[in-house]
């Protein structure tokens, strides 16, 4: 028997209260652990538990394709499309790496979530005044600890499910840091909770891990170099998503 769809009442009276409890409990454990776990490893475990609970409670099933392309213990920059609030839970649950995200500064203001991100070693970027030198310094500090990064270079969730243009900033940082980039395609996640809709639906999602890309070795990389790399990665990420949209729309 299939899982019945979640109607608005189920979201409001069951899912939202459940997610609130998960966030408070896992967030509190994460924040407390940061006082004795400076690397944030336990905090990441809390984030993975939180993500797993969210997916299970919502009824999201995930197929992971291509995970064997990754080498355990390697530090990567994971680059993914962004169409739903559920993208991060999907990635956190199914990537067996210690990862940190580059998040917009506004998230730092959220109670519990913002505190967890700050104490857990995640990076914040002010879009209006990005301090790339400071970000690169903090990025390298994370890399020295063997931590990988997750980037959503569209900058925000897309409305129509298509993959928007990738901004070049994070790719310039990746070139400067010399880290391999792993394109990730999250297919079908928009059906769970698209931008602008509160109600959630169960869905079958695919997380496609593409071949790692080693950025060019450049003494002084330019924005043009970053844009070229961004376009290349964008096309890889977008291909299976656009194919899925074509199938849906006939």
Q: Which residue ranges define each predicted feature?
A:
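A secondary-structure boundary/capping signal
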Residues: 66, 80-82, 103-104, 152-154, ...
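Short gly/ser/thr-rich secondary-structure transition/capping motifs
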Residues: 58-65, 132-133, 189-192
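Structural motif corresponding to alpha-helix initiation and N-cap regions
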Residues: 64-67, 73, 110, 133-136
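Catalytic core of membrane glycerolipid acyltransferases/transacylases, capturing the structured
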Residues: 26-44, 48, 55-58, 72-129
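Non-catalytic C-terminal accessory region of glycerolipid acyltransferases
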Residues: 2, 134-250
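Membrane-interfacial terminal anchoring regions of lipid-handling membrane enzymes
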Residues: 1-35, 41, 45, 68-71, ...
């Amino acid at each position: 028997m299939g899982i019945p769809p979640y109607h608005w009442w189920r979201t409001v009276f069951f899912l939202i209260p459940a997610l609130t409890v998960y966030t408070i409990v896992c967030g509190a454990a994460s924040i407390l652990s940061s006082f004795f776990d400076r690397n944030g490893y336990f905090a990441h475990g809390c984030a993975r538990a939180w993500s797993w609970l969210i997916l299970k409670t919502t009824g999201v099933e995930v197929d992971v394709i291509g995970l064997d392309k990754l080498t355990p213990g390697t530090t990567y920059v994971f680059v993914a499309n962004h169409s739903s609030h559920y993208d991060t839970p999907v990635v956190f649950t199914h990537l067996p790496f210690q990862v940190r995200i580059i998040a917009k500064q506004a998230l730092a203001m959220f109670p519990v979530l913002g505190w967890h991100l700050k104490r857990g070693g995640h990076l914040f970027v002010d879009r209006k005044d990005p301090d790339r030198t400071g970000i690169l310094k903090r990025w390298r500090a994370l890399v020295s600890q063997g931590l990988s990064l997750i980037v959503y270079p569209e900058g925000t969730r897309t409305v129509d499910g298509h993959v928007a243009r990738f901004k070049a900033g994070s790719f310039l940082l990746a070139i400067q840091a010399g880290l391999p980039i792993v394109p990730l395609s999250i297919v079908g996640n928009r059906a769970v909770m698209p931008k602008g809709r509160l109600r959630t639906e169960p869905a079958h999602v695919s997380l496609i891990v593409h071949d790692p890309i080693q950025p060019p070795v450049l003494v002084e990389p330019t924005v043009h170099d970053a844009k070229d790399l961004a376009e290349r990665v964008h096309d890889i990420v977008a291909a299976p998503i656009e194919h899925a949209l074509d199938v849906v729309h006939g």
